[in-house]
């Protein structure tokens, strides 16, 4: 069997489909290296027909780095590093915005691996957008304005208290998460630690304000940036099939899960790979 992976770009800026890998078995070092560099280059990659268990998903994710355990979402049985995103009428989707995962911590995730376990008959697509392409499309004066600015990211923006009052145990878990994750600052423009490329690093899910400018200026800048980053030309859209896998670079992308499938059910498993502290370095 050939060790060579087939990598087909899905657009000029972001996204590729990969075939020739069996993720139910450990990848060879050669194949993992190809996969790793494909994620760096294309920012999100997709593989079909990968019926992996939570344990196998964890093992694959651990080859990319140390894993994050989410403070609120439920975990797969016996595998704390795999969160279960089970959405249906009694538990509707709660992240109906474009976001980068877990930017409310000092070292936001470097990436994530998402596995489709149960899908609606139609709908439930996920879209990703490229912060690199969005940054490179800006004029030079506007890039200069943004470079060096810092923005606040707040856990509570996507996890407000009212959503976690069903039980006292749930509310207590939320309070503990808030105490452990106070608002913090990240650069508005982030330098990728491996490629050196610059990317916009603000997202509607967690970014609350730009601290180096006035309140009105912050509102205007964030309103523009949220709209600009999510322009269709910077996006790729994936129509899920059972046992599909998506792997993305969380440092330079945002994503949006379409909530158009209720009352049907959608179950996804996610492993989240820890990253490093965001920084900006002039190119």
UniProtKB/Swiss-Prot annotation:
GO terms for biological process: protein homotetramerization; sulfur compound metabolic process; taurine catabolic process. InterPro entries: AtsK-like, TauD-like_sf, TauD/TfdA-like. Disruption phenotype: Disruption of this gene leads to a loss of the ability to utilize taurine as a source of sulfur, but does not affect the utilization of a range of other aliphatic sulfonates as sulfur sources. Activated by ascorbate and inhibited by divalent metal ions such as zinc, copper and cobalt. The modification 3-hydroxytryptophan is found at residues 128, 240, 248. Taurine binds at residues 70, 73, 95, 102, 270. Belongs to the TfdA dioxygenase family. This is Alpha-ketoglutarate-dependent taurine dioxygenase.
